[in-house]
Amino acid sequence: MANQKIRIRLKAFDHNILDQSAEKIVETAKNTGAKVAGPVPLPTEKDVVTILRATHKYKDSREQFEIRTHKRLIDILSPSPKTVDALMRLDLPAGVDIEIKL
């Protein structure tokens, strides 16, 4: 695994949990001797939903709700088998979605 890199994308609705998870991953990778680039904040997706407040009429009265998806990118350069093993055992919060590419 000398010339490979691991690219980790994290997604979450809460940016505090996301930053804590990214910090755990960076700390774990650095403890095993790998070089780390990141966490890089990626653009936040904003999903807006507009609904009518009334059930049958009054179309002018509407309400908008939004949900923001925060994203981070971490590159682990020259990972060792020890790094991969440590990352597989890492326990992260339930609200964080993780995508890993080799």
Swiss-Prot record:
<dbReference type="GO" id="GO:0003735">
    <property type="term" value="F:structural constituent of ribosome"/>
</dbReference>
<dbReference type="GO" id="GO:0000049">
    <property type="term" value="F:tRNA binding"/>
</dbReference>
<dbReference type="InterPro" id="IPR027486">
    <property type="entry name" value="Ribosomal_uS10_dom"/>
</dbReference>
<keyword id="KW-0687">Ribonucleoprotein</keyword>
<dbReference type="InterPro" id="IPR001848">
    <property type="entry name" value="Ribosomal_uS10"/>
</dbReference>
<dbReference type="InterPro" id="IPR018268">
    <property type="entry name" value="Ribosomal_uS10_CS"/>
</dbReference>
<dbReference type="GO" id="GO:0006412">
    <property type="term" value="P:translation"/>
</dbReference>
<dbReference type="Pfam" id="PF00338">
    <property type="entry name" value="Ribosomal_S10"/>
</dbReference>
<dbReference type="InterPro" id="IPR036838">
    <property type="entry name" value="Ribosomal_uS10_dom_sf"/>
</dbReference>
<dbReference type="GO" id="GO:1990904">
    <property type="term" value="C:ribonucleoprotein complex"/>
</dbReference>
<comment type="function">
    <text>Involved in the binding of tRNA to the ribosomes.</text>
</comment>
<dbReference type="GO" id="GO:0005840">
    <property type="term" value="C:ribosome"/>
</dbReference>
<keyword id="KW-0689">Ribosomal protein</keyword>
<protein>
    <recommendedName>
        <fullName>Small ribosomal subunit protein uS10</fullName>
    </recommendedName>
</protein>
<comment type="subunit">
    <text>Part of the 30S ribosomal subunit.</text>
</comment>
<comment type="similarity">
    <text>Belongs to the universal ribosomal protein uS10 family.</text>
</comment>
